Amino acid sequence: MSRLEHRFAQLKTEGRAALVTFITAGDPGYDTSLKVLKGLPAAGADVIELGMPFTDPMADGVAIQLATLRALDAGQTLQKTLQMVSEFRVDDQTTPIVLMGYYNPIHRFGVEAFVAQAKEAGVDGLIIVDLPPEHDAELATPAQASGIDFIRLTTPTTDDARLPRVLERSSGFVYYVSVAGVTGAGSATTEHVTEAIARLRRHTDLPISVGFGIRTPEQAAAIARLADGVVVGSAFVDKIASAESPEHAIDGVLTLCAALAEGVRSARR
């Protein structure tokens, strides 16, 4: 059983959803980002998505685009992102880490080398936002063969005809993008999410995590009553962007994480 499978199974027995947190690797600098990464589990993160900075983050809104630029300006590379995971794993062998980003840096790195180093570092899953199922076998097949889950995105525009193709060979969990658009967009209604999750459950037994637009403990709790996972990203990135110092960035992210975690944990009480 993979770390992701184990974590979602564990939380199912506890009767609650997972808090899935996103930060961009290397934002605002390597050392600060690593401290945030290491602090997230104790603050309540159940699964961590770690963004791989790329020069053309077309699926991301302004907040994450700026986070990517800060990280790249500070010297972050894909190799350093894998190094961050390795350093995280020294003290934490249980919290799943999912790398999220675009295919171009992986292609340039070399798929075989990337998969091997990601596995060695302790990466548990991949979300590659610009690789549709028709074109992802070059990465998905070797990743899954090595034990790294390949997590695909579904959206409000993914109809029943296409959904089986998107879910085919998916593993880890399904990421439902609740709002069509870029990251940080407005949140969907609970009625819409309820209907979407019911439709997804007719097609898959995988855990379903819902993201895009969730920023407050109240919003997190509302989604946690419906989904297996609640994904929060832009709200954390905004805390880093507005911080007056690295210490304030770390404190801001971890304080928000704790509040969101309480919202998720209280949702089904």
From Swiss-Prot:
Q: In which pathway does it act?
A: Amino-acid biosynthesis; L-tryptophan biosynthesis; L-tryptophan from chorismate: step 5/5
PROSITE patterns in the record: TRP_SYNTHASE_ALPHA
Identify the catalytic residues: 49 (proton acceptor), 60 (proton acceptor)
Question: Transmembrane stretches, by residue range?
Answer: none
Q: Which domain of life is it from?
A: Bacteria
CDD domains in UniProt: Tryptophan_synthase_alpha
- Which reaction is the catalytic activity of this chain? (1S,2R)-1-C-(indol-3-yl)glycerol 3-phosphate + L-serine = D-glyceraldehyde 3-phosphate + L-tryptophan + H2O
Keywords assigned by UniProt? Answer: Amino-acid biosynthesis, Aromatic amino acid biosynthesis, Lyase, Tryptophan biosynthesis
A molecular-function term among this protein's GO annotations: tryptophan synthase activity
What Enzyme Commission number(s) apply to this enzyme?
Answer: 4.2.1.20
The protein's assembly and partners = Tetramer of two alpha and two beta chains.
Q: What is this protein called?
A: Tryptophan synthase alpha chain
